[in-house]
């Protein structure tokens, strides 16, 4: 499913992928919060509301599901993991892991961080300001484009 390495990503696809990468931290925080909420409720159905600035939770009656607590939690976790946001999180994590493939671990770590910073803000962090010793400019941008291409392919954008 991966596109050939010599193909450039279309501009609109590249922009979509950059926004996926830039939203990664926020989406991951939201995912972890949702996951903890599901796990902490123990499968109980509840409604959360705010009264006078104080958050309260009211548990809803579930007589027909009382014995299926674990199943309810598993179902809700599976539904959460099937969302587009979680697919994007996983795609970014997998692509980020493979940024430095074939390089010594120290250089791979530096490259991974440099590509990440460049994707977050390319104007603030161009190659010249990232000081990745041992890597040429063309190699850096090729690796960054492979990172973006892998995410695009996994998300079905290209």
Locations of the language-model features?
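Residue-level marker of positions within ordered structural domains that often coincide
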Residues: 29, 120, 145
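Helix-turn-helix DNA-binding module
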Residues: 121-138
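DNA major-groove recognition helices of helix-turn-helix
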Residues: 140-154
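N-terminal interaction/assembly modules
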Residues: 1-106, 157
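Short amphipathic alpha helix immediately N-terminal
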Residues: 104-125
């Amino acid at each position: 499913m991966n596109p050939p390495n010599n193909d450039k990503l279309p501009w609109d696809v590249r922009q979509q992928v950059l926004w996926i990468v830039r939203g990664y931290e926020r989406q991951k925080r939201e995912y972890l919060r949702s996951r903890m909420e599901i796990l902490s409720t123990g499968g109980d159905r509840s409604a959360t509301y705010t009264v006078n600035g104080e958050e309260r939770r009211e548990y809803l009656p579930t007589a027909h599901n009382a014995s299926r607590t674990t199943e309810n939690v598993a179902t809700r976790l599976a539904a959460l993991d099937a969302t587009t946001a979680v697919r994007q999180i996983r795609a970014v994590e997998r692509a980020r892991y493979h940024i430095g493939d074939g390089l010594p671990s120290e250089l791979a770590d530096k490259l991974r961080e440099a590509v990440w910073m460049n994707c977050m803000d390319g104007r603030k962090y161009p190659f010249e300001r990232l000081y990745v010793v041992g890597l040429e400019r063309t190699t850096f941008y090729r690796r960054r484009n492979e990172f973006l291409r892998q995410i695009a392919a996994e998300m079905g954008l290209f």
